[in-house]
Amino acid sequence: KFKLRNLERVAITINYTSAPEIPTVHMGSRTTSYIMKGVTNAHSNFAKAFRENHWYNISGIDVYTMSNNMSAIAIIGNSITDGKCSTDNAQNRWPDVMSEMLQLKHKITNQGVLNLGIGNNRVTVPGGFGALAKERFDRDILMQSGVKKVVIFEGVNDIGAARSGSSETVARKIIESIQGMVKKAKARKMKVY
């Protein structure tokens, strides 16, 4: 149990008895991970650690509160959401800025922002990174705790990957898939943007 303030950054330490053969990785996290041999904790000297600008092994963190009025805005997207062109360790991806604006400028302190962006992700055209947005929507959006609002910010990579002459077909498939995501979210009383 930790007492956290709004917008507070959290560091996570994981100790393994042996390294995973195939670790999960978030290549575009734009946040430094520190990797060391042996048991580590908050008091370890991370100056000697191997540094890598990726996240490993964490699929999510649930934050529990005593308030009944808390909720989350979940954003499904591609590299633009994931943080492409943001600054390493600055936490200035557009969902980070959105969260700060809601909290600091608009005084909306009861909503968290969940960034479910994956670089080069696509809605319907295979070949990008991660599961297609239409396939990961249930897991990445609908199964998140406390989500009341959803932002769908996907499709540009499908358009870019479309073969010549197939743009109308790709556009139709994107629209149909996003409409399916909207229908699922609305069935759970979520507001969709």
Q: What are the language-model segments listed below?
A:
Residues 1-76, 81-88:
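N-terminal secretory targeting modules
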Residues 18-19, 79-83, 118-124, 156-160:
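Solvent-exposed loop/turn segments at secondary-structure junctions
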Residues 65-70, 100-109:
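Secondary-structure boundary elements
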Residues 72-77, 81, 111-117, 148-154, ...:
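Structural recognition of the beta-strand scaffold that forms the well-ordered cores
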Residues 89, 96, 100, 106, ...:
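Alpha-helical cap/lid subdomain in secreted, periplasmic
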Residues 106-125:
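Short connector loops at secondary-structure junctions
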